[in-house]
Amino acid sequence: MSRVGKYPVTVPAGVTITVKDNVVTAKGKLGEMTYTAAGEVETRLEDNLIWVKPLSETKHARQQWGTTRARINNLVRGVSEGFSRKLELVGVGYKAAAQGKVLKLSLGFSHDVDFPIPEDLKITTPAPNQIEISGVDKQRVGQIASEIRSYRSPEPYKGKGVKYAGEQILRKEGKKK
């Protein structure tokens, strides 16, 4: 039995949910999102609770049960609170600046990296060595944060690079004489 799937998703005040043919649509103060659930599960809206139930006892149906419930929960949280991810730039001369629809990154290359800011996300730079990515879709926020981090992943000797806020970089010892 799924430990995640057996609990309902609570719909907060200010969020409107519609469920039709396993398509869940959520509207909130931050926007609107839609999720199409897998065919092996059934979704129902009762009062202010969204229940997810597997249609059969197959292994795949049980796998989709918890996944669907988690995705619907992220959908509801996204349109009500939103998601954000913070990145830190560590290194001499490493800096970022959001200019219009482009994020300019100086990461020690011979040129600046221009990263186009997607329409559905908001990217801010509270400090020259910090980037904050926020949006409605949890997967999209994490994907863009990962793409920005991949330009210069933290290296293990000095820890220079783009890292997630609070991330611990495994450090190595240098060569011994």
From Swiss-Prot:
It comes from the Bacteria. Keywords: Ribonucleoprotein, Ribosomal protein, RNA-binding, rRNA-binding. One of its GO terms (molecular function) is rRNA binding. InterPro entries: Ribosomal_uL6-like, Ribosomal_uL6-like_a/b-dom_sf, Ribosomal_uL6_a/b-dom, Ribosomal_uL6_bac-type, Ribosomal_uL6_CS. Pfam families: Ribosomal_L6. Part of the 50S ribosomal subunit. This protein binds to the 23S rRNA, and is important in its secondary structure. It is located near the subunit interface in the base of the L7/L12 stalk, and near the tRNA binding site of the peptidyltransferase center. This is Large ribosomal subunit protein uL6. It comes from Rhodospirillum rubrum (strain ATCC 11170 / ATH 1.1.1 / DSM 467 / LMG 4362 / NCIMB 8255 / S1). The gene is rplF.
